[in-house]
């Protein structure tokens, strides 16, 4: 089965270990679960994805301060180019940038395939007027992958995504972590089946729900609205693929989640075509 990882982090080699550890600590304190000792330099990503049988990967990283935006986007473009066709990259934006329009145009000129935002780490709410301006500036030209859900903060709760979904129907939004990290059932109630421009990814979900609960959520959103993702280096891709394939889904549902939905959003077509994308 073709597998596309729609949610994978990558860091410069010099800081990959430090950055990976910092993110792990950010979540490990909250979740109280064991997180693999992994780093996310490009070589680490490619090795882990190959071991898991993942054919294509979306790389992302977030700018925690505005002046990082263009440098990170150039880095992400280089990593995609250096991956031998195995990776695409989503760029980053920051709502406090002095030139958000310039950042958007630069991101698109680099050939980045989407925008990843992490409100909790970047310090803004999904429905903040400055964030809404970013969605407006992108104008539906590429999709947004948004971290959603964390009860410690009031930045990315599922309800805060709704104004963007309503205001920008031409823009595709992907709510990471099944639309609400650690409070999936609540997210499902307010988001599932309601918005034509909403997808969710299944990353960082298996640790907190049963296989049956995961399937219920998939079917509430519709398998045609769900994307596979590992959230590497948070989790081992091999383990995440194994857990996904073990879910009591139909073969059609697996195929949609593993490849077809993501390929549609990224205009990849079949794996043979995607190899040269």
Predicted regions: what they are:
Residues 44-48, 72-79, 103-107, 130-134, ...:
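A general structural detector for well-ordered alpha-helical segments in enzyme core domains, enriched
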Residues 55-56, 63-146, 150-152, 194-196, ...:
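Active-site gating/metal-coordination segments in enzymes
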Residues 24-37, 60, 146-148, 169-175:
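Acidic/glycine-enriched edge-of-secondary-structure segments
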